[in-house]
């Protein structure tokens, strides 16, 4: 396990091994079959396909935050399934090309993403709220109130 963080979104990134840094991959444009679950997603930018989501638990709720720069709220779906699963998905289309345009570089991400989270028993599934501001999706799942055990003092006789 490397103690160095990966900045390449799941790709090999051992800074001490020059062959592990995917700087130039001569085979990346060949259409090899891929049996991975993400094979149905476009391969333009793995950073978008593997959208990162933060999940924190506060005393009142479970809060999920996803950075989705450039997406409109209409391009994102937040769903809750009966078996306590929160699903966040969306898609950004590739920009349409004009025959007169000459592209020098294409680095902006495009493609589909899908993230699923199994929620704990204390989640109020019927009270989930979502908002999107400045490209950050925030999903708030309130928690059931935990009833405090009622403590009754017993007088000791004798």
Swiss-Prot record:
> Per the record, GO CC terms?
cytoplasm; protein-containing complex
Q: Where does the UniProt entry say this protein principally localizes?
A: cytoplasm
Q: What GO terms describe the biological role, i.e. biological process, of this protein?
A: protein stabilization
Q: Do you know which PROSITE patterns this protein is assigned to? A: SHSP
GO molecular function terms here? identical protein binding
Which protein family is it in? Belongs to the small heat shock protein (HSP20) family.
| Annotated ranges, domain sHSP | 44-158
Q: Where in the cell is it found?
A: Cytoplasm
Listed A to Z, the keywords are: Cytoplasm, Stress response
Which InterPro entries does this chain map to?
A: A-crystallin/Hsp20_dom, HSP20-like_chaperone, Small_HSP
Q: How does it assemble?
A: Forms oligomeric structures.
Protein name, per record:
18.1 kDa class I heat shock protein
């Amino acid at each position: 396990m490397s103690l160095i963080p990966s900045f390449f979104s799941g790709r090999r990134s051992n800074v001490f091994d020059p062959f592990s840094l995917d700087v130039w991959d001569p085979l990346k444009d060949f259409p090899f079959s891929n049996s991975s679950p993400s094979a149905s997603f476009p391969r333009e930018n793995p950073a978008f396909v593997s959208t990162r989501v933060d999940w924190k638990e506060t005393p009142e709720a479970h809060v999920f935050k996803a950075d989705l720069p450039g997406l409109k709220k209409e391009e994102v779906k937040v769903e809750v399934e009966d078996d306590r699963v929160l699903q966040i998905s969306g898609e950004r289309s590739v920009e349409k090309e004009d025959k007169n345009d000459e592209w020098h570089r294409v680095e902006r991400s495009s493609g589909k993403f899908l993230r699923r989270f199994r929620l704990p028993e204390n989640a109020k599934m019927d009270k989930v709220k979502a908002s999107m501001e400045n490209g950050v999706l925030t999903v708030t799942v309130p928690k059931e109130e935990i009833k405090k055990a009622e403590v009754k003092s017993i007088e000791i006789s004798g």
